[in-house]
Regions:
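Active-site-proximal cofactor/substrate-binding loop regions of enzyme domains
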Residues: 1-11
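Short, well-ordered alpha-helical microsegments
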Residues: 2, 30-31, 101, 126, ...
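Short, acidic/small-residue loops that bind anionic groups at enzyme active sites
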Residues: 9-34, 41-48, 171-176
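Glycine-rich, charge-decorated loop segments at or immediately adjacent to ligand/cofactor-binding or catalytic sites
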Residues: 28-38, 184-192
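Conserved anion/nucleotide-ligand pocket segment
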Residues: 39-101, 105
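Internal helical hairpin/lid segments
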Residues: 108-160
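ATP/nucleoside-binding phosphotransfer catalytic cores, i.e., glycine-rich phosphate-binding loops
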Residues: 152-193
Length: 193
């Protein structure tokens, strides 16, 4: 688990020697911690092994990211399902639901106030996703977000994830689903920060 590394990281050293930090899933803990403690933008992106058989979209999205996002419309050509429309401005943060849920209540939990949050997961049962999202709601982590992007929850229909949220809270922010976020072959690269 990447969470075990957090107490031993020298964030001042990382800040003085900026590098591209990229990955997804369990690395969500590191990506968000590095951004929040250094201000360096990290990348929720494919892992090196994902490039063994990459799609053109995945390569294009990753290259756009490492070149500073010259193409500003990150979701161009990506299917997006809109559940609650609107305009959101904020800092993009997020990643793997279970990993980030485990950080809530620790010094490493992400500050979601004013953020556009994205969440994804894989191989979790619906009741587990329900429990984790309920934890976010009860911890107040969704109270002041500006927007929410639901990624791929492989094995669970995105409408079910939306239903979990909408039954427990008033959704007064833009909420969309993007199937290219998470444990999928056509993976979009998103900036954390």
């Amino acid at each position: 688990s990447c969470m075990k590394l957090l107490p031993d990281l020298d964030f001042n050293l990382i800040q003085r020697n900026p590098k591209i930090f990229a990955g997804f899933s369990d690395l969500s803990a590191l990506l968000n911690a590095i951004y929040e403690r250094t201000g360096l933008v990290t990348l929720h992106s494919p892992m090196i092994t994902n490039f063994s058989e990459p799609s053109k979209f995945m390569v294009r999205s990753f290259l756009n990211a490492i070149n500073g996002f010259p193409q500003k419309d990150l979701f161009a050509g990506v299917p997006v399902n809109v559940y609650c429309s609107g305009i959101a401005r904020g800092t993009l943060k997020g990643g793997n639901l279970v990993t980030l849920t485990a950080l809530i209540g620790t010094q490493w939990e992400i500050d979601t106030d004013g953020s556009i949050l994205f969440l994804e997961d894989v191989n979790e049962k619906l009741y587990e996703v329900d429990r984790n999202l309920t934890h976010w709601i009860l911890a107040g982590k969704l109270r002041k977000i500006k927007g929410l992007i639901l990624g791929n929850f492989r094995g669970i229909k995105n409408k079910e994830v939306y239903r979990i949220l909408s039954q427990q809270m008033e959704i007064d922010f833009p909420l969309v689903h993007c199937p290219y976020i998470g444990h999928v072959q056509n993976k979009i690269t998103l900036p954390v920060g």
